[in-house]
């Protein structure tokens, strides 16, 4: 490398050829393929000039030929260049700058298949090491180049293989691109099954170092990075019980209490939601518990944080519908969805804490609890208003219309819909995370809080609930679980039942119930069948609430299809999971309740189903008795005994 000339001298030797593109191309090939570093350097300098002039942008074939002519080892040597007895500081800087500039341009111009090859991805480690002594302009180019490389899985794996990421970590508080590189690397690599463990190890190694690096700053960039990265990780790649969780939450708490900017509020909201989703067992207590070491006169942190989230939601709703077609709506929707997710988690944590006397580290005075209850109720009422307006703008056109009464639709590539000008042109309502999170928080609140007015308001969304339930099998988001949870709270009131039946809700959930029976008994796969069975249990609870309500005199004729469907159930010889067993028992309970409450004539028409139902009870008893959980086994056996007695009385 001692014989290498500075970049300027190499460029001068090739300038004469620039006027002849063919001669230039051949000269560059010759120089780049030479065995000596001096010629290679001259060729590289000439190549940079040609690339900067844009002469090869529209010639992918020649671009690829020149890329293949480059020696990867030579590029690595240039990237490693540093000042010594033989190389001046200026020359070493020129060498690094030249290699970085050429790699940066090629990373942009090369087609995807070439960017996946080792010839480019193998430069990741030398590029990271070159960050140590690079000036700001070169550092920025290096980071942009690495970011392009790791946007594909092959490049992401190269970052995972680097043992020392300290050059990247140490500049992360000055260059957000460094955090973007880590995010792309982890999320892309996590999609490869064989790399999940490596991703976990890398995260556990890097995040503690990042926490130290951002110490003494407001850490907004870092907190935002973790909040955006965690939800994109494959669930299996998220580290289990990480040691960095507690110090990370301490950073989040510090940001919340420091009167942050709008960017800071977005960052802590999304991080809190991401951590609660990834670590539902450990994070709620770490985030919401009272810090006894603080000022005893100060309000609990959980009160402060939840109150700030509620204020953000309430202040955002009035102008949100007008922003549906604006560029800022997706970001606002994401932030408010995260806020609702945090509030949902807090409500669950609050209920558990009040029920469990052993939870001693959560304390909130009665007056603060009452104020929080009032604020949450007010926010949920505004939430209902927004959901109503958003749905009407998107689908219904007017509150509560039965689907058959909707008119004025226009054909689009996605079916027919009302041509209302305020509906989002690109964000369908059934793909809006804010709608899902808003319904989820509302469902939890009306179930836990005895607020009849709010339940009646929620019942006014019944047309939206039923339609979204049907659309869940087609869209990217699954609304069925929060909707079923909301229905449990709504079915306490007669207005809720009338609205549900008026929108054909029974038929919609019954169709889902039949599909769940097929998936759990005919072609069961343990994981999916258990998830489906859990949803089936929720459906049964909703339907039982309707049947048992004082407003329901007798079951309708069409409801009795549940009985014939249950008699066709197949109990598998191999013991299913406990939740599937519980679901099958619940189906028997639903059927016997329908038969018990039916009128005389209807009972006679379906009395032939009783022997088949009794046979199912007998089939399930040995399976239940052999369950691993003895407590659950005894409870289900008692239910089966009750069902056997009810069916015997129906004969």
Model-derived features with residue positions:
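Terminal, non-catalytic domain-edge segments
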Residues: 315, 319, 345, 349, ...
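Alpha-solenoid helical-repeat scaffolds
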Residues: 324-494
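Core register positions within helices of long alpha-helical scaffolds
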Residues: 46-49, 98-105, 144-148, 181-184, ...
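Long, low-complexity intrinsically disordered regions in eukaryotic proteins
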Residues: 224-229, 246-256, 271, 289-290
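Amphipathic alpha-helical protein-interaction segments enriched in hydrophobic
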Residues: 270, 334-337, 436, 480-485, ...
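Acidic, Ser/Thr- and Gly/Pro-rich intrinsically disordered linkers and low-complexity segments
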Residues: 23-26, 78-94, 246-250, 284-335, ...
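Elongated alpha-helical scaffolds that mediate protein-protein interactions in large eukaryotic proteins
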Residues: 2-205, 212-221, 230-246, 261-264, ...
